[in-house]
UniProtKB/Swiss-Prot annotation:
Organism: Schizosaccharomyces pombe (strain 972 / ATCC 24843) (Fission yeast)
EC number: 4.3.2.1
Subunit structure and binding partners: Homotetramer.
Superkingdom of origin: Eukaryota
Positions of the catalytic residues: H160, S281
GO terms assigned for molecular function: argininosuccinate lyase activity
Protein's gene: argx
Protein name: Probable argininosuccinate lyase
Pathway the protein contributes to: Amino-acid biosynthesis; L-arginine biosynthesis; L-arginine from L-ornithine and carbamoyl phosphate: step 3/3
Entry coiled-coil feature ranges: none
UniProt lineage: Eukaryota, Fungi, Dikarya, Ascomycota, Taphrinomycotina
Binding positions (2-(N(omega)-L-arginino)succinate): S26, N114, T159, N289, Y321, Q326, K329
NCBIfam families reported for this sequence: argH
Known catalytic reactions: 2-(N(omega)-L-arginino)succinate = fumarate + L-arginine
Entries under PANTHER family matching the protein: ARGININOSUCCINATE LYASE (PTHR43814:SF1)
Biological processes, Gene Ontology terms: arginine biosynthetic process via ornithine; L-arginine biosynthetic process; urea cycle
Length: 460
């Protein structure tokens, strides 16, 4: 391709190697930012008119032309040309065809693709964050609804994947919901740092025509202006921060997916996935595979890889803009889509999930109440370290007799400590056990209801 067809072609006399042209272009993935690019150009055109760089008539033509370009993108009528290196060159080329290059050529006055591209990215990401935030709220609402409807189901709580203590199923769900609620809070913080204006920074040294950056800030809805022009064009912290956030939320999604995969197995059978989020086997007719959950777990690694790959790309580049920064877009776009899809899939899984209370109840075992047995003596003044040992001795006694601790007699317990009395049998009640965990954050019904209200209030 002749260099004269390119925005930067005046310096060059030779044609670019075709492979280099393909290697250099980004239009096939950054074209999704067409709206952001047009919004940025419209605002910049207005700033140029304010400074007398273009006339009011030229501004009107630019604004109308840019809207015509936008309409072509929206209606899939925009035709890409070989010279369209990226979304910025494509839009400027098409604008020139519509209103003439004499006017369109003034649009880039004082503007560099360096400040243009990062403005587009911030505008695009800002819109994505709004969509993701709404999806997170929807997911949390499903968590709350399920926690309310399943409040009376008591299940084994696990540590080290070993049965530990009885808890409410709702308490388990809300443990994951609070992680997602923290993700929502972090997302709001990220938004404020994304929502800062780089436009008007030029290539690196600033704008030579004194465009009003405060006007650009208000026109494009940014919260503030990036005060250093070099930082404005070089900064990709907001990309990395979003990808870190995406990795964090995918970690939380993956951990819940793993729990539900385990609980959906025939060995547990605590839950049954809806057919809408399951698949079968090509050879084994009886299979119902939790592919939705496995993909949620698997795609977390994809998002982690996007973050690490881009961090490696930027860790050693010198100041301001370098072409390495073009590698920010594909991982950003992919992480955003993957996270949004994952949130929506998890929302569907949870809203259609069938809980099997009878199977859950069958999994409750008396040994899970060994701590309660120790606490029985604590309430009578015996030090916990001593009661822990005594309760452990009761567990061992039951194992040696090939029975469970709730089958031991009062005399058996008295042989371990004289303060055990007839009411020790009351220890072996799962409902009573969970209701004792009544400090803030516990699994008692009152505490779980308080947790539900906390999340509801946070979503107001």
């Amino acid at each position: 391709m002749a260099s004269s067809q390119k925005l930067w072609g005046g310096r060059f006399t030779g044609a670019t190697d075709p492979l280099m042209t393909a290697y250099n272009e980004s239009i096939h993935y950054d074209k999704r930012m067409f709206n952001a690019d047009i919004d940025g150009s419209k605002a910049y055109a207005k700033a140029l008119e304010q400074r007398g760089i273009i006339s009011a008539d030229e501004l009107d033509k630019m604004l109308d032309g840019l809207e015509a370009v936008r309409d072509e993108w929206k209606t899939n009528k925009f035709t890409l040309q070989p010279s369209d290196e990226d979304i910025h060159t494509a839009n400027e080329r098409r604008l020139g065809e519509i209103i003439g290059t004499g006017i369109a050529g003034k649009l880039h006055t004082g503007r560099s693709r360096n400040d243009q591209v990062t403005t587009d990215m911030r505008l695009w990401l800002r819109d994505e964050l709004d969509i993701i935030q709404k999806s997170l709220v929807g997911l949390l609402q499903v968590f709350v609804a399920r926690a309310e409807s399943d409040l009376d189901i008591i299940m084994p709580g696990y540590t080290h994947l070993q049965r530990a203590q009885p808890i409410r199923w709702s308490h388990f769900l809300l443990s994951h919901a609070f992680s997602i609620l923290n993700d929502l809070d972090r997302l709001k913080q990220i938004y404020s740092r994304v929502n800062r204006l780089p436009l008007g920074a030029g290539a690196l040294a600033g704008n030579p025509f004194a465009v009003d950056r405060k006007f650009l800030q208000k026109e494009l809805g940014f919260e503030g202006v990036i005060m250093n022009s070099m930082n404005a064009v070089a900064d990709r912290d907001y990309v990395i921060e979003f990808m870190f956030w995406a990795s964090m939320v995918m970690t939380h999604i993956s951990r819940l997916a793993e729990d539900l995969i385990i609980y959906s197995t025939s060995e547990f059978n605590f839950v049954t996935l809806s057919d809408a989020y399951s698949t079968g086997s090509s050879i084994m007719p009886q299979k119902k595979n939790p592919d939705s959950l496995e993909l949620l777990r698997g795609k977390s690694g994809r998002v982690f890889g996007n973050m690490m790959g881009f961090m490696v790309s930027v860790k050693g580049i010198p100041s301001t803009y370098n072409k390495d920064l073009q590698e920010d877009k594909e991982p950003l776009f992919d992480s955003s889509k993957t996270v949004l899809d994952s949130i929506q899939i998890l929302t569907g899984v949870l809203s259609t999930l069938t809980v099997n209370p009878e199977n859950i109840a069958k999994s409750l075992t008396a040994d899970m109440l060994a701590t309660d047995l120790a606490e029985y003596l604590v309430r009578k003044g015996v030090p916990f370290r001593e009661t822990h040992h005594i309760s452990g001795s009761a567990v061992r006694m039951a194992e040696e007799r090939n029975t469970t601790i709730d089958k031991l007699s009062v005399e058996d317990f008295k042989s371990l400590h004289p303060l055990y009395e007839e009411d020790v049998a009351d220890v072996f009640n799962y409902e009573s056990s969970v209701e004792k965990r009544c400090a803030i954050g516990g699994t008692a019904k009152s505490c779980v209801l308080e947790q539900i209200q906390t999340i509801k209030k946070a979503l107001e």
